[in-house]
């Protein structure tokens, strides 16, 4: 998925929270359905560009969103990577109430990383990951959001954007503020907006939100550059009783798909659980998991849960009621 600026030392910060106060869904959003949709993505296998599962997964997303939303369009282009590889990529935009002038943008990436470069087993490092959390969880969430909005229309127009090529290679930024080897889909969309005057009220990137041990801190770039959106999202979560999952502490600065939008002045924040793996009970925003699943072959379906998708889905639908 992305890169994080982890602190060198494990931070505990006295954050010994009650780990689980989940008392059931707060809306009719269906977390179990979101999990099933994520499983459908995982069943296609690794979904990195150029692999058989890539187009199968994209075709499935397009077909499912056409059943549920008012319009579906694609952006297709050939991307040249930092090493000169040519990738055939696809962004998918599903719109609810497309005629509404007031709009909210939700973003997730649907591709998976082509190599498990953080796997501790050196024999696994060149293998593509399944991306149950880092890829499929966001897709599952968005298809279930489309289910919800079809039955309960939002108060504004909602754009559900599935971006491709997020997780291809290095997350290094160049002197112009561009990312030559990753974040391809979000950069392409930010440079090819649906219209010249496209300016959503706010945007939220949902990434790695299926972790069964859900702990979402406020991403540092989002806090610095779109604090009003961070406040809106975390206040909504608190009102739903989810303040021990959406933790009101500033976490790490993450290179992710919100960055190209922020560069263009579109206030998109990053909602993600970067600490993917078991955490000690007394943890903080810089605590490393005891076992890391991120960018490894351990990012498998058994690591994500309907409960986590329910929590995030409840927040997402409440934001646009």
Regions found by a protein language model. Give the residues of each.
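C-terminal motif of bacterial Sec signal peptides marking the signal peptidase cleavage site
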Residues: 11-14
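A non-catalytic alpha/beta surface segment that caps or lines the substrate-entry region
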Residues: 40-99
């Amino acid at each position: 998925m992305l890169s994080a600026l982890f602190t060198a030392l494990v931070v505990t910060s006295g954050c010994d929270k009650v780990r689980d106060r989940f008392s059931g869904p707060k809306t009719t959003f269906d977390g179990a359905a979101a999990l099933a949709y994520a499983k459908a993505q995982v069943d296609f296998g690794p979904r990195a560009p150029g692999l058989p599962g890539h187009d199968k997964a994209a075709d499935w997303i397009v077909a499912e969103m056409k059943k549920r939303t008012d319009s579906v369009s694609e952006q297709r282009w050939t991307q040249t990577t930092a090493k000169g590889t040519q990738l055939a990529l696809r962004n998918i935009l599903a719109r609810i109430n497309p005629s509404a002038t007031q709009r909210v943008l939700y973003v997730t990436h649907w591709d998976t990383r082509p190599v498990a470069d953080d796997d501790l087993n050196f024999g696994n490092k060149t293998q593509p990951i399944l991306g149950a959390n880092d890829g499929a969880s966001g897709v599952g969430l968005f298809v279930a959001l489309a289910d919800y909005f079809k039955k309960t229309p939002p108060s504004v127009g909602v754009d559900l954007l599935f971006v491709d090529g997020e997780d291809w290679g290095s997350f290094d930024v160049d002197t112009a503020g561009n990312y030559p080897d990753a974040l391809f889909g979000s950069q392409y969309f930010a440079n090819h907006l649906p219209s010249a005057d496209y300016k959503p009220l706010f945007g939220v990137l949902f990434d790695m939100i299926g972790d069964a041990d859900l702990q979402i801190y406020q991403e540092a770039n989002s806090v610095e550059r779109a604090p009003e959106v961070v406040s809106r999202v975390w206040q909504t979560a608190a009102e739903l009783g989810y303040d021990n999952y959406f933790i009101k502490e500033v976490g790490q600065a993450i290179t992710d798909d919100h960055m190209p939008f922020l560069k263009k002045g579109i206030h998109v924040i990053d909602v993600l659980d970067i600490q993917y793996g078991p955490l000690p009970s007394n943890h903080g925003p810089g605590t490393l998991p005891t076992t890391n699943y991120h960018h490894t072959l351990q990012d498998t379906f058994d690591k994500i849960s309907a409960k986590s998708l329910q929590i995030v889905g409840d927040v997402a639908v409440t934001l646009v009621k």
